Amino acid sequence: MVGPGLGINQVRRKGVYSTKKGSGDNLLLMKRQGKHDIHDRESDDLSGHDAFSPSKKRGKIDSITEDEIEVKKLSTVATFDKLSRSFPNSEVQAAKNAALRGKEKEEEKVVSIPLIQNLKNEDIESIKCRNNNLLDGKKLLLEAELSAVEDNQIFSSSFPEDKKLSLQSCLSSKEQIIKKLQVREEYMSKFKLPPMLFSDELLTEVEPFMPIVMDILEGKISSAYYFEAKNAFKNSQKAYLSVDEFRKLNLNKFTAGFYGLKRQLRVGEEIAKRYKRALTHNQPATLKWWGITDFCNYVLAPETLTSFCIYQLNLSNKSCSSKTPNKHPKQQLNEKEYYYDPELRMLAYDLLEDTVEYGIIVADSDPIEQWEAAIEEDRLRELKLDVHNYSSRRWRLDTHD
């Protein structure tokens, strides 16, 4: 039964968008019930009479509403006519204006009723950032590293205490540069690592190995990094990789060892550009959770560098496998089975895992652009350190010779 002064539409609105305490929990249910009740009444009316077509029903409702408005207007006019007999014209006009202002305020309150939302404001802002590509891998990595410095938990306990990573190595103090040389000499003698390439050189060298990206996406090859990424996704209760969860990740499992994170991220950027279309369409659940940028940086880039590692270090000599091609990778793109050989890839995975410390302390502080080499040498002169002995140039020249 519609109360006096209320239209049918107003009653429905109050029933569905009630803001009384406790109504938020039942909001969706009330909406569904309201829709079903209205639909049932309309279907019953439409089944028997053509006179109650949707257009005619709307006309009838509109006419009822118009009649009610006219009645309200007439009653208002009659009321003020009575008042005009007992008060001066100025007071009557003031009363009319006050009544109109009160009515406008009531209408504004009805229109501006806020709907209850299920998402918290911070969640909505995070989703907006993700949709606008504001939470890219570099920003997440930076925040995670800063947090880790505060907590003194950069890497897991896989390293001894005296070899725990310190991000302050990037500050290039004299002690840190001396320590860097010690780490470099230790790992170079133990693993015979190749020289660090500049970014343009690296991208040129790894280009022939990038087709592994499509093979991973199509499930043609198993991936150790994809396996770790999938586990992180399964253990999460979030719809996407959040900053907090990124901070909790063990980055050892997503780092391409001696290549370092800086060069790994450059490869990831190139992969994201080249395979943007394939990465956007038909995304697996793991890729959706990580996001394209982070998936390229921490899954596809290290897998590409794993293939490059097999080529650079000629790991077939350390394997019992009889496959020992000595061709340049551009000449053996049709020999994927060589670089996809499980035995060779396991050797590469082990090597990269064992050289994570080298990658962070040495590779990430080495110049990644050619013009940075001059800055490095200027810094060594400022600290009164021997340029030939401590500069990265020495290791590039010695290794090539």
UniProtKB/Swiss-Prot annotation:
Biased composition (Basic and acidic residues): 35-48
Taxonomy, superkingdom: Eukaryota
Stored Pfam families: RTC4
Broad class of the protein's primary localization: cytoplasm
Localization of this protein: Cytoplasm; Nucleus
Residues where Phosphoserine is found: 23
SMART domains, sorted: RTC4 (SM01312)
Keywords noted in UniProt: Cytoplasm, Nucleus, Phosphoprotein
InterPro entries: RTC4 (IPR039024), RTC4_C (IPR028094)
Region Disordered, residue ranges: 35-59
Gene Ontology cellular component list: cytoplasm; nucleus
Protein's job: May be involved in a process influencing telomere capping.
PANTHER family: RESTRICTION OF TELOMERE CAPPING PROTEIN 4
Family statement: Belongs to the RTC4 family.
Annotated protein name in UniProt: Restriction of telomere capping protein 4
Native species: Saccharomyces cerevisiae (strain YJM789) (Baker's yeast)
Gene name of the encoded protein: RTC4
